Regions:
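N-terminal accessory scaffold of Fe(II)-dependent oxygenases
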Residues: 1-209, 217-249
Length: 249
């Protein structure tokens, strides 16, 4: 009984810290050459742009059209994933959710790239037993969703994207049906609190990425061509439980 009580107290404490969010509208930036400082910046719990990472050679349009493994991913009933990507453009909205995005990532090679480059820079020895990365591949515009993982890394593969971010404290100003929407497309017909809806646009080019802390709102769009984007969700047991319990995933 005492053990259960102690575990219960620990769970409550961890949940409390998970729910704490910094709502400052500022971002940090760092060059990949300074990656030894990544962990210290992540402790600030504000968005962090990482520049000039080693390029990702997977999940580009060329990669999807050339590797046969993508043709067999069961995303659509009537057409293949390859056909959809080949006909999509910068205005196409990504039609799949996290479960399908994870299936695509599993064959893309994202985990190999992340294990070689990203994980060693941010997952310390003691965090290996606590953080569990989950990988997702997206194609097309992705509307608003709320970050749940302790950290979510967003990175474009082969073209520039614009990521819109909003802190948790703007939630009361959002439309009732904010999910999958885009901040720059909301009007006074969607919400009477449009002037309170503050967001920041961050331009990411291939080789750059954005770490987003939990409890922020994010969306992204491409320019000129369909955006091919990868995300890596660094989950703690608490955030993973919240992810599976969320009605938005």
């Amino acid at each position: 009984m005492e053990i259960l009580l102690v575990l219960g107290v620990i769970f409550v404490i961890l949940t409390f810290f998970y729910k704490q969010a910094v709502c400052e509208f500022r971002i940090n930036q760092i060059e990949w050459a300074q990656k030894e400082n990544l962990s210290a910046l992540l402790h600030e719990k504000i968005p962090l742009v990482v520049r000039t990472l080693p390029p990702a050679t997977f999940w580009s349009i060329e990669d999807v059209l050339s590797r046969e493994c993508y043709a067999n991913v069961p995303i659509f009933q009537e057409i293949s994933l390859v056909e959809w990507v080949s006909h999509a453009n910068d205005q196409s909205v990504c039609p799949w959710k996290y479960q399908q995005a994870e299936k695509i990532a599993a064959i893309s090679g994202m985990s190999v790239w992340a294990t070689k480059w990203l994980h060693p820079a941010i997952i310390s020895r003691w965090l290996k037993a606590w953080w569990h990365p989950r990988y997702h591949c997206w194609a097309g515009r992705v509307g608003l969703r709320k970050t749940i993982a302790t950290w979510t890394y967003i990175f474009p593969i082969d073209s520039e994207i614009i990521v819109s971010i909003m802190p948790e404290n703007v939630e009361t100003a959002l439309p009732a049906t904010w999910l999958d929407g885009f901040p720059d497309e909301f009007t006074a017909k969607d919400t009477p609190f449009l002037t309170d809806l503050k967001y920041m646009d961050i331009i990411l080019r291939p080789g750059n990425g954005l770490f987003m802390p939990a409890h922020w709102f994010v969306s992204w769009k491409g320019q000129q061509k369909i955006p091919m984007v990868g995300t890596i969700s660094y989950h703690s047991p608490i955030s993973l439980l919240a992810f599976h319990a969320s009605p938005f995933t």
